[in-house]
Amino acid sequence: MNDLLKNKLKLIPHKPGCYLWKDQFNQIIYIGKAKDLYNRTHSYFNGCKDNKTSKLVNNINDLEYIVVNNVNEALILENNLIKTHLPKYNILLKDGSNYPYIMITNEQYPRLKYVRTYDKNKGIYFGPLADSTNKYQLFNLLNSIFPFNKCNHQPYKKCIYYDLHQCINQVQQSTYQEAISEVKEIFKGNLDHILMILQTKEQHAVTKLDFENAQKYAEQQKALTSIINSGLVQLDNNESFDIIGFYEKNNYLVIIIFNYVKGKLLNKSADTFAIYDYEINELITSFLMQYYSQNKISSKIIVSLDDDNLLALSQRFHTKFINAQTKFHKRILKLALDNAILYFESNIKNVINKQNELDDALNQLKQILKLPDLNIIECFDNSNINLSLPIAGMIVYQNGKLNNKLNRKYNLMTTKNASDYHFMIEVITRRYQRLVSQHQKLPNLIVVDGGKLQVNAALYALAQLQINIPLIGLKKDQKHKTDAIVLTNGDEIVLDRKSILYKFLANMQNDVHNYAISFLRDKHTKSIFNSLLDNVQGLGKKRFNELLKYYDSINDLKSASDQELLQFLPKNVLVNLREKLNKI
């Protein structure tokens, strides 16, 4: 421990707050909260805790701390700081940890939607749901049974669901409320009423010799019973709560969540994390702050935590966070723990192997480039069609893993003398001019898809901004396969195709290429539509964009029936559109 850190530790008060450990390069590597900052920070250096803590402690070179009024404020501040700085030794909720929900919107004409974001102000949510494929089948089944609005257009226009009696033209507001009530009962596992309705419809169809619909109603009954029963485990009571179980071994932590609704297990989710802090209470609390900040929360959360953290979480989310108190809750918590152990034993070998491969790749790259850290890598690729419709894509690797939430798309300017060189200058300038002006953290490394031309363009842009960020290019061979690292001095390092580093960089280059190409394809489709349908009288921007949502090509548009297109267009505009399409 250096003298500066020793002196700072002596001055820390016995008050609640957050502490930020920094390494020798002034990078924040871990953020924690404490009821007593002095006791908590000193505990890291009071003898060797274990391997996981020693790895963190060995990298500590400096400290910052922020004093707050109470533990609840510290909890909120810690969560915000972790989201801002993304420290390498903190538990970070993985990208894609927003679990799926089935949602009924609170619009005048409600729609049933399958979503991965939770916003209680937008409607009624059912979930979170496990096994996305099976639950999407449930979504489609519910949409076929109940007459929720299927369209985005005005309610007075007929749509393709009109003849199926699933159109807003044929549904009263009272019917929507009945449908919502039925869906609520289904997610409680109460199928008797809806099955009786479907059976009645089936019998009525048979009486009318309408065997096609009779078969449909019979299949709906079978599918509904199968999907619901396969996904729900019945308890012997009628409670709604979440159970949090966790298991720690060999510097890894498994956290498992059971979501019970009205006595039925609706979802089971599990995550595995490498950990570097000995205080499990703090790690679990940090995870729960992140998880419930972006997922639906139950009215009761049962988790084995100390009283201070339970109280802080309860105050933060205005719901009950409690230890298991009854025999029933203890039995379910034991079940969650058993599941966490089983998950650890069945998955940990694969998790460790993947993490070791990732660590090896990052260490090799750090060694080659002589860089201390690679927490954040930003990778760029430009794309265009004969220098028209130029775009750029940027993907972000956080601690070696792709974080899709941080990816960005750029529409680039076209000029008379535009080239790939100028496009790269533009996107690098726009990205880092913004980060600097907003005082945001710069990446540890920039990777550009390309050779010397692209590297020199990026270097020029950074020089104009007067900032210095390590930079490399990834060059491909004649077969369009990743081949070599291009350094800023023009030297190339040919990659061994059997190495872990090659696999890591090739995946990165493919990821950014696919991201950019996908964006270009969407833009190109829109451009073709725009040029071919230009000057169609009455087809304004709003109607044009609505058509793009449903038709991927001019051929799709040509084959659409008038009845379909009248959902989006007045009759006179449809006539004008048909005249234009017939000339193409």
Swiss-Prot record:
A Pfam family per the record: UvrC_RNaseH
Source domain of life: Bacteria
PROSITE patterns, per database record: GIY_YIG (PS50164), UVRC (PS50165)
Record domain GIY-YIG: where: 14-91
UniProtKB keywords: Cytoplasm, DNA damage, DNA excision, DNA repair, Excision nuclease, SOS response
Chief subcellular location: cytoplasm
GO molecular function terms attached to this record: DNA binding; excinuclease ABC activity
GO BP terms in the entry: nucleotide-excision repair; SOS response
Compartments, as annotated in UniProt: Cytoplasm
Domain UVR: residue ranges: 192-227
Any one cellular-component term (Gene Ontology): excinuclease repair complex
Role, per record: The UvrABC repair system catalyzes the recognition and processing of DNA lesions. UvrC both incises the 5' and 3' sides of the lesion. The N-terminal half is responsible for the 3' incision and the C-terminal half is responsible for the 5' incision.
Alphabetized HAMAP family for the sequence: UvrC (MF_00203)
Subunit description: Interacts with UvrB in an incision complex.
Family: Belongs to the UvrC family.
Record-given protein name: UvrABC system protein C
Lineage: Bacteria, Bacillati, Mycoplasmatota, Mycoplasmoidales, Mycoplasmoidaceae
